[in-house]
Amino acid sequence: MWMKFIKIRKDERLSVCLFLLWQLIMHATVIIPYYSVFSRISKDYRKNFLDWFHVSGFDPLTYCVVTDWTTAYDVHRHPLLAFFYYPVYLINQGLMSLLGINCVQFLVAIVLLISSLYAFLLMMRIGKDLLHLSQRESSVLAFLLFSFAYVLLAAISPDHFILSLFLILLVIYVTGKQMAEHKPLKKWQTIVFFILTAGVSLNNGLKVLLADLFSKGKRFFHPKNLILVVILPAAAIWSFGLWEYKTFVADSVNTRKAHEKKAVKDEKTKMWNEFSDTTHLKDSKQQTEVFALLWKKHRKAQLKAKYSAPQYAHSGTPVSKQPFLNWTDVTTSRYETLVENLFGESIQLHQRYTLCDVIRDRPVFVSYNWVVNYIVEGLIVLLFLGGIWAGRRSKLMWMCLSFFALDMILHIGLGFGINEVYIMTAHWAYVIPLCIGCLIKSMKGGIRNAITLLTALIAFYLIVYNSALVIFTL
């Protein structure tokens, strides 16, 4: 079964060759500018990668993990990701000993390229095997998905998003095949998919549970299924994340907090010594009261400077400052987010602040210089909405829309990561070509060919437009 999945079919080869050629060019675009710095053997790899790598808001933490293994990711959100990369780290250690250079860029690029290739193949096969489109139509949908700006960037950036896209599409494909045969997902399939998907990015594990719900219907709520497929795997992942935090992270966090507390205490002592040496006040109580006011004013100025930095200034007000809820945002404009970021930057890069990071040097909202960008955005949204209507009787489409709805609740509703919502594009963008596929499937003759041609032209435009901006910016 797996060999059949891995093997590239004869009618897929041309599309795959074109896709690989394009991806190799884009990987070279990311590797070349940083090679002279990242290939050197150094003592502080983490600082080196974080200081130099700058592709939008993507983090080069995978470079850190593969070079000098640590649980560099947020262990609650990505509990297994560092462990998945451990074999790659061992290979890199061997190559570093043999060659005397850090091969991290090439090794990570191989992982990303394989993930991208099979995500591309899965999108094609969803079109052909599940929607029953032609090979040509399915290829157009797959190229459309990867033409989206932040799917393209996810495919070439050392972050987790392209791995998540591959796993989500694998879940959709396997679940779709099972539903087409009127069979539910097997328990072991759901458990394995959940562990892998949630292990890479915790919230995507919920999509596996939604897939299980769609494949089983009411049987999903059977106590045995809830215990074996939902409760035990979720408890295992969460417990592993807690163990991972205590084992690998807690000590460094406590040390950092202690250093910060000591630094503030030392600064206060230094200020007090300077104040007491220069003040004309003689009364010790009066000195203490005046210094307390000076220190309060000083700390207020420090905090004001800290929170005026883009990392904080570009974040809205959270629902609460409690853990997890402090990632939410209730004040950032939803309308501008939808127009300029969710269906804007996610799909078409802006001409200004290209590949800039909202935490460093990019405003939350940027407008396009050309009206054609808004026209293309409008066409894609119309095709998407038309596809939802055309596929309204498709169980597969509603399952994928439930995945999309989950992301929209998190990002648009609760505001999780809303100030850079486009970074998460790979988690949900597949729903657009899938819905357009439903629209194509519902049509016949000239109208079907016209919609396919329009989709192909949009994909070609986005490939050229986004690729050119990336190449000339880097």
Per-region residue spans from a language model:
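Transmembrane signal-anchor helices characteristic of membrane glycosylation enzymes that use polyprenol
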Residues: 7-58, 64-69, 232-248, 458-465
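Lumenal/periplasmic acceptor-binding loop at the mouth of the active site in multi-pass
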Residues: 60-106, 289-384, 397-400
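Transmembrane-helix motifs of polytopic, lipid-linked glycan transferases
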Residues: 110-131, 383-386
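Transmembrane-helix signature of polytopic, membrane-embedded enzymes
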Residues: 123-147, 398
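Transmembrane alpha-helix segments characteristic
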Residues: 139-142, 394-411
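Short acidic/glycine- and proline-prone juxtamembrane loop motifs at membrane-interface regions
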Residues: 156-161
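Specific aromatic-rich, kink-prone transmembrane helix
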Residues: 163-180, 435
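Membrane-interface alpha helices of multi-pass inner-membrane proteins
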Residues: 185-204, 208-216, 229-235, 457
